[in-house]
Amino acid sequence: NINGHRKQAVEWLRALGIPVLRWPGGCFADDYHWRDGIGPVQKRPRRVNIHWGNYTEDNSFGTHEFIELCRLIGAEPYIAGNVGSGTPQEMRDWVEYCNYPSGSSLADERAANGSPEPFRVRYWGVGNENWGCGGNMTPEEYAAHYRRFSTYLRDFGDTRLFLIACGPGGNNLEWTRRFMEAMPRRTRIHGYAMHYYSRGRDHARRFTVESLRAQLATFWDLEKAILEQRALLDKYDKDRRIGLLVDEWGVWDRIDPEEEKRYGRLFQHITMRSALAAALGLNVFHRQADKLVMCNLAQTVNVLHALLLTDGPRCIRTTTYYAFELMKPHRGATAVRVQAPEAPPPALSVSASRRQDEIIVTLVNPRHDAGLDVECALSRGTAGNARARILHHPDFNAANTFETPDLIVPRDHPVSASGSSLRVELPPLAIVTVQARLSGV
């Protein structure tokens, strides 16, 4: 380990190039009091996590540990503050503790706890799911809380805060409309975060074909939700001062009661289907990159649509991890508009981007019963030196396990480039990323 952080997990997460990491929740955020997680670990109080099984939270992972993890993996921290059971004073003090350079009592306390330099946390969520576990508020009630809390959240030193309001669960346009109508234009709000989960009908390892199709089709609904939420925000925010986020998204599947007792309520098996869902979601975000400022998978380790699973000393990369790995070449590139044949979902999903003289295309075939011979035609220029990687397994219930951790991993895949076209064959249940040299543009 590295100061208590599992070394293997740190190395694998750093390799993905994760840009932003969100913490401490989730529903837990609105019952979390930050002072519980600072100071000597052995003196930190133990609290009951009332949302997820009433287990004891020992607070050994607090603010300093979170910031250290972010630095180790190269991610910017995003902290979700407590609006549901907290106070404006508590959140205001947390910002000062993290960001004030030196000379105040809170900055001196941070230094005494081992961090003389400010953490420079830019991203702050003002509550989480306040329509539900974050306080069961109406849009108007939450808007009043947001106005009050945000009044006291200030920039310190050279850190300019990016304040994020709680948006709807799913495509709830009524929540957005009523919240925006209750917000005066002078209110400091930089981001608006919706959540989107695709709930599984079956146990994660026992999906039927019908359940597979139903779950994967929900990612076409995700794209519709992004378009409609952004369009509604634009009515109140014509200059797009407020960025749209999807700061919780992913699949949420069922497990057996005995598995819940062993691993916890939010554990789930990560299968080939999970990887397809992740890739479909990422393709949506790529296609709608001009309408989004941030998206955060739920979650990272051992919970829901996880990248990594651990069991004692063992740690494995899930198929979700490898879906993200295949998408990594798009990071830092510019989105390219794509047109694909229309078909009832789930169907072929495509996103593309360009980085200088390179074109990157990710294709997802979510069908279980048919392969696809795909030709990608470039509107300008020619392609050459093409290479491709594939993540594929013929069984959508197959998974990387602690016994077979490398069952499903990316492999090289044939692709051809000729003139202005790329050609690649996709077997059923496959994710392929193609990279090619672009010339003549």
Where are these regions (language model features)?
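Non-catalytic accessory regions flanking glycosidase/transglycosidase catalytic cores in CAZymes
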Residues: 1-177, 181-191, 219-223, 227-255, ...
